[in-house]
Amino acid sequence: SSSAASDVYKRQYLFRALERCGWYEKTDDLGKTWRQMVENHLTTCVESDTDTRSDCHAWEALLCYELPAVILGVRPAALGFQKVRIEPQVGTFREASGDVITPRGLIHAEWKRDEENALHLHYTLPDGVAYANEEV
């Protein structure tokens, strides 16, 4: 686990495994990498947690996937986003909102946890896109 956590490239696999096990909140500890990049005023992604310069490594851009698909929870449920599933992994976050660009238009999703920890989800879908969660 420490090997996977320390190797930035392997985090994509660690994040998916934690998500599938229902332990996505454990990824919060690994967010320091991206916070450090912002604090160091880097304009591209680092290769490892110990780097203080950006080398433009695509695998460190994992957050570009995590935010819309996992934190917001917006994923296609059919080819080309004909149907969409919205299932956020909230972790330790209290709220999130954002827009996801799809071939069919912009999807807006936002959620917030209340004092009782209940999740309140609001979304807008482009014309012709169905919400798939109701089928489950």
Give names to the regions the model predicted.
Residues 14-15:
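Conserved small-residue packing positions in alpha-helical repeats and bundles
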Residues 1-5, 9:
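Single conserved hydrophobic/aromatic residue that forms the stacking wall/gate
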Residues 20, 25-136:
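Non-catalytic C-terminal accessory modules of carbohydrate-active enzymes
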